[in-house]
Amino acid sequence: MRRAGRGGSSTLNRRSRTMSRRMLVWRDVRVLAYVYPGWHPIRERDERYAPGFTEWDLVLECRPRFPGHAQPRLPLWGRYDDRDPAAVERRVALCRDHGVDGLVFGFFWCRGKQVFQEALDLGFLGSPTGRSFPFAVMWANRMPRGVLPVRRADLPVIDPDRLVPTDVDDFVALVRTLAERYFVREGYIRVGGRAYLSIFDSTFFLRELGLDGARAAITAARAMLASAGLPPLHLAAIDPSAEVIGQVAGAGFDSVTHYVLLPDWKGPLLQDYQERAALRAREWPLVAARAQLPYHPSVSPGWDASPRGADFGDTRPDRYPWSPVITGEHPDHFRVAVARAVAHARACGLPPDQQLVFVASLNEWSEGHYLEPDTRFGLAWIEALRDGRVAATRLR
């Protein structure tokens, strides 16, 4: 397959370069990119690993695990500390100039304990462009992995210790914290006039609390916001399983979406990007029908979590983070996926301020999905997002 140069594919470069030097203004659908905030040291990892450890160590040291494996995947601009406003400024400006309308930051909270919040508080909100750029938060109700790279394949994929329990009081405290710190900001993303918040593991949230408990927690949080004069809430359920998807509307969620909706998690090791992306797009209307709520499509440029797993050689385990791996990913194919998602969002008949597309993600390098420049394709990933929007949306 044709490979793009460091500045992007020749097809993309023939398009007007002036588009990447100014903020694009779109008529309808908003495209929002998830942000993984784990690119700085934290005390918990300093104590568990070597001082200063971050997942950059995994990304930069990963080696091919099978013939043709595209590893390591290296950042063209080098490793960075996402608490540094200067490093964040450059990336936010790149998003602004290439059709990303806002960022959704993972917010790790476990009964008041927070980790990785400095990427948002110091890096993003500390940068001039960040302070004026739309953003929202996703409650990451799983704490970061305690062992990296993962070395045992006999343990649960999701360690029970990582799952974040909650109850009515804790959920209200979480929402109050987010509202007072972020919802009140002028640049905070609103959907239908309400502050946008998503829950990463909505299945665990509903399974743990039950339908009645989840409804009580969400109702109490909304009442707290109203009584405190804080912005009202638009709550999105991410990736609800078949077990709970019929409960999300009754619990009080307003919409459904996904984080990474690309691989078949129980499928073969190697899965083709074009096949998987097309199949997932056909599932979007089914998700909305099952949830009886608006569905906001999510697309990804790729998937390969190999950096998070130890090298088992030929005995590569058939499970996360070793498997599956998406192959054949390319900016041209991602451009098609973006155009398809934008067209779907527009065709759903929602009001313009409720038409959303999500991209996973801006920077989750250790899982192989990112828009930031890499050494294989240069700027072509984020240029593909821009050009996918051009293909599906008229400029104002």
Where is each model-derived feature located?
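The substrate-binding groove and active-site-proximal loops of carbohydrate-active enzymes
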Residues: 71-85, 101-113, 155-169, 195-211, ...
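Aromatic-lined substrate-binding rim segments of carbohydrate-active enzymes
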Residues: 87-137, 297
